[in-house]
Amino acid sequence: MGSQQSKLDFRNAVLRLHEERNIPKFDLIWERLWTLPETTEDVFHLMSIDDLTKVKDNAPENLQTIIAVLWDKLEDLQKETLFDDPAAPTTKCALNCMRLLTRLMPIIFEDKSMLEWFDYFAWTVPKDPNINTPRGASFLNTVVDYLFLINFTIPAHNDLTHGVHYCIWETGVVYHPTMLKERSYELHRVEVLRLLLSLFSEEIYRTDGNGSSCCAYVASIANRRLVLCLLSSLINTAMRFNTMFWKPEFLPLDNSVAHMSLIEYCFSVLLILMSEENNNGTPCYNNYRSSKNTLPKNYFSILLSKLQPYSDFQIILDGMSRLLYPPMQSTIPKRSSLIMFDYYPLVLIFCKLFIHYNERFFHYLIDTDRAIDLFIFLLYLSFEYLGDPSTYNHLKLCVILLKRLTAEKYFCKRLNKPFQQQTALPISMPVPFEGGTYADFTIIAISLLVQYTKDYHSEIAQMLCCSLCYLCLYAQNLNSHSSQSLFELFQSASYPGFLISNDVNHKILKYVIGAINNAIQYAQKYNAPLLYFFSMHKDYIEAVSALSFDAIMSVRNSSAEGDSAYWTRNGKTFSSKAFDSILLSRLRYVRSKSPTPYYPIESSEFGFTNLKDVTSKDEITDGFDKALRSNSLRTHRDSRPVQPLLKQRPQLHRALTESATLHGNDRSLEDTDEAKVEPIAHSVDYTFKPTVEWWNKWWPSLNFRTMLDIFTDLSLKISDMKKAGHPASEIMAMIKTQKYPATNQPYIPKYRTKEWRQQLANFARLFAWQVSCDLDSHKREGPGIFEGTDVKIFDSF
């Protein structure tokens, strides 16, 4: 405010709100509230949450009165004022009314009795026969119109010098001419969008599953020109943000913070409107909607689904690329580059929703190299999010997009081309991967992600394994590294202790087996290294297929009281040899029945990495036992949460480097410092009690037979050729020309059901709210609209 006296007068007006009862509408206190403040910070600092809570508790009628007065004032100002001077008192008055309402609405929504009053106040049609719309509809129309008010948020247009003119703020989708840009218009748009976000926040304070009446109304406005202009304005403003120099093209650096606020609120309001599917609001709103005898629709998502010019798709892809990729290439200090790291979720949610509503955009995306850029970036970002428990939903969003891309046949086939370093990844940190295809890279990265997440985020691990199932249907020319990663994933997923630690882990094993079967059945002549590698380890697969529930439970029940061989009672995981004896005994039995000797993999002949031959008959007792311990240690080591993002280099680089080191090292993991694993937190269902009935429901459905039929026959031929001294090239030629058993139906996990799509839509909406609330918080230098209020929607998220 301009002076200490003004601040004191405003503060006294706030105190009167909870000290006096029934302040009339014509009292001068209301005028002081909208004339004295100068900035949003003044309103939020001098009208605290504690003050408003006292008003709600001691004089709720004053809170109701101020809402009514502010609504009327904003409507009157729009009708009667020209707004030809940004410094005019009327402009300041309108802005302060918006700031006050932004501050007040969360207090109204968090209280049940106040929400009931607001529902009646906003959505009950007045008894006046000349009025057929409720106050809420009129007010929301007014607020939206402020976004297109001449000389307030847009410049004069031709002969139009005042009033509302629906137009698109920024060049881009649908609109190409450039509009005059002024800083005052940007700041005013921020205030209007912030008010809309506050009005939409009703649903984050509810626990009944119903949405926001205000958001549902705005999304269902049947004015095509308004919807087109607002949707295009929000998209274009967000997509035109030039991050290359960390400032907008038309603003000096000092004003970039204000423009970044506009980007944040454009994204937030856009995502909330796009994802609006819950048309159930408060009782009075529902009555109002039913009285109109029309089914409510989300015209924003409908219009988005009809967007089809390739030029518009190109604009959106260019904008997403600017927002996602350049910050990772930036040479400026990491602390500054993290500014855009906060925006990644907003861009990815938008991408997910756009793909969800517009199939044309998705097909356009996969027809270009941008899809591979996005795919590699998502893998990279997944490792970055892996180390922080607070970014679980960020990781889940990346995995959802990965799964959607790999579910497309044409995209999976494109991954068979040779891998090239991506410009989307940091210049200073190239991926330590060469000599393979994008499919090889993807299998290695996803296998690592599954081993990192399977003990902590089973849902994410399952989705990643589903992606492997789709990819392996079309993957060709897989090299030794990816073949080995796939086998290690099978080892990790088939560990007996892991299978019985809860009631869903077996799904991960089922998906991994499905991925292997898809790879060996549908690209046999192209995947000779994969077939050779698994054939040489077919005894291990047969040993796993011979596991019995009784043997596993006997080990578990023989452990200390209250403990499991896979975890301890205090939730800490340790490496354990308890279950190794089961696999070892099964392997001995399989080897004793095997008609052919075992020949170790010769890395020099077949180009495989120098993997320790841990299953040789000569070292069956010592070697296999050692390998099981090594595999157990590796599993738990990989499951450890990695260090926070700022303390180390990119996690994808780190993970691939470690994986390559392990594959090329003769030493057992237990001979390294990494082998001395400390206890780590572990998500185990301690209430789960495995039963024979539970085991028999899923164990028979695991398709070991397809693998064993192929690998058993192939291993016999490989053994005969090795005994005859045939070179590696002839063995590989035999594998490529071999006639294999008839293929079964491919294993394709079903996920694109109506229920799954609804779950994804709900997740995207909740996540959009979570990110919006986080960006608005004080720690992100936001005004803190929702801080100090009782937000309920994230309790179970």
Swiss-Prot record:
It comes from the Eukaryota. Pfam families: Hid1. Keywords: Cytoplasm, Nucleus. GO terms for cellular component: cytoplasm; cytosol; Golgi medial cisterna; Golgi trans cisterna; membrane; nucleus. It is found in: Cytoplasm; Nucleus. Belongs to the hid-1 family. This is Hid-1 family protein P27G11.12. It comes from Schizosaccharomyces pombe (strain 972 / ATCC 24843).
